[in-house]
């Protein structure tokens, strides 16, 4: 298997709700699995990016939000074996028990450090045991488990993205041209696994469309003539994207296929391309190849920014990947993709991330609009030149 194909396959993961509270629930459930007796306290220590992203996130299978409730529900009813879908089997009585745990002041969330590097530490103390679970770098990568003072070593996830600290990440050893050569030449049968992302993300969209709790998607449905797939590609793309993201941040009971540890990234990198595929009649093979490119560009950017950065990676990283995917579907050149990247970087890079919340829906709509404009301008050879602003670069690896 091509190592880029393997990289995508490893990075794609189902995630129920926003990935940050999902990771907190996973860690809490894992810690609880090592303890017996009644829960006395739960302490959650987070890096700043994790703290920010989970602050007002909707928690799957409930109407609650935030890190405290994610940890409480993880302790009460989480199944750590399900990873980022740890809360998929929650019942109403579990929600009520978690609410009592929070109301009694038994759950405490602490800001551990200022960093874009993922860090979660959950301490579960009962009247019989104490367990400490630590996660670092990726959302489910357990690096340490300590039970009643005894350290247990847990094998970390194998990562093909790079080697030793400071070593160039695998994705950064490729130029944009080389990524496109891979896209053009990889056997399409090796890319079939990505179809699962469309199945999963479209089911999430349908959940958002049918939910009484969503608002943005219903407005965009009206703007799209009351149908999901209209002849207006961009409106269809915005509709699909917003519906899935809104469902996700509300915590509706359907997973997204995440990329770079984010369900919203996975949605933005895929569903607008599906709109283009349906409206314009592109082949499934074209869609899969465009999706692989979209994913890789997103991953390339995220390896620079960090998984939990201060800027909106959904719009900037996934949106840029999607813009390149649109150029690819339309038969554009590598130079045109460079132009689309410049247009995205020169326009929406200033968008901040204020955590996983309803605002992500609006950011997704903005990302679609910017990506379509960036791709269309680049196809007409109109782009922000390398001498200007944040786009300026003495020597750029991508595109050479």
Each model region followed by its residue ranges:
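Membrane-embedded translocation segments of transport machinery
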Residues: 228-231, 235, 248-282
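Signature of multi-pass transmembrane helix bundles
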Residues: 103-251
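Conserved small/polar residues in nucleotide/adenosyl-binding loops
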Residues: 396-399
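Generic N-terminal amphipathic, Lys/Arg-enriched alpha-helix
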Residues: 3-16, 178-181
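Alpha-helical support elements that line or immediately flank enzyme active sites
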Residues: 21-37, 266-282, 323-331
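A structural-propensity feature for long, helix-poor, extended segments
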Residues: 40-83, 95-107, 286-336, 340, ...
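Conserved phosphate/anionic-ligand binding catalytic regions in large, soluble enzymes, centered on
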Residues: 14-30, 254-271, 313-317
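Flexible, glycine/charged-enriched surface loops at secondary-structure junctions
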Residues: 38-42, 82-87, 108-111, 189-195, ...
């Amino acid at each position: 298997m091509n190592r880029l194909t393997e990289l995508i396959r490893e990075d794609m993961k189902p995630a129920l709700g926003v990935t940050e509270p999902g990771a907190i629930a996973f860690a809490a459930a894992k810690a609880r699995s090592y303890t017996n007796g009644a829960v006395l306290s739960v302490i959650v220590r987070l890096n700043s990016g994790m703290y920010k992203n989970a602050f007002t996130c909707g928690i799957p299978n409930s109407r609650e939000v935030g890190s405290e409730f994610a940890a409480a529900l993880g302790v009460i009813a989480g199944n750590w074996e399900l990873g980022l879908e740890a809360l998929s089997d929650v019942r109403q009585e579990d929600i009520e028990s978690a609410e009592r745990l929070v109301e009694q002041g038994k759950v405490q969330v602490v800001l551990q450090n200022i960093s874009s590097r993922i860090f979660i530490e959950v301490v579960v103390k009962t009247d019989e045991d104490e367990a400490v679970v630590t996660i670092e770098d990726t959302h489910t990568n357990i690096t340490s488990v300590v039970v009643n003072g005894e350290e247990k070593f847990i094998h970390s996830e194998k990562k093909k993205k790079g080697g030793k600290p400071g070593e160039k990440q695998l994705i950064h050893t490729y130029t944009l041209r080389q990524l496109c050569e891979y896209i053009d030449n990889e056997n399409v049968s090796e890319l079939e696994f990505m179809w699962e992302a469309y199945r999963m993300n479209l089911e999430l969209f349908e959940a958002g469309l049918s939910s009484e709790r969503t608002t943005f998607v219903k407005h965009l449905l009206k703007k799209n003539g009351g149908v999901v797939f209209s002849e207006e590609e961009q409106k269809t793309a915005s509709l699909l994207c917003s519906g899935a993201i809104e469902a996700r941040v509300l915590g509706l009971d359907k997973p997204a296929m995440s990329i770079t540890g984010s369900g919203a990234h996975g949605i933005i990198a895929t569903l607008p391309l599906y709109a283009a595929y349906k409206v314009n009649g592109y082949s499934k093979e074209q869609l899969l190849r465009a999706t692989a490119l979209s994913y890789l560009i997103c991953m390339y950017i995220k390896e620079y920014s960090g998984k939990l950065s201060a800027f909106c990676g959904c719009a900037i990283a996934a949106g840029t990947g999607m813009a390149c995917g649109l150029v690819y579907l339309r038969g554009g050149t590598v130079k045109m993709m460079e132009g689309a990247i410049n247009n995205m970087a020169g326009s929406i890079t200033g968008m901040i991330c204020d955590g996983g919340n309803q605002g992500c829906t609006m950011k997704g709509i903005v990302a679609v609009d910017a990506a379509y404009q960036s791709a269309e301008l680049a196809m007409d050879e109109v782009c922000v030149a390398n001498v200007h602003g944040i786009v300026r670069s003495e020597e750029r690896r991508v595109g050479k």
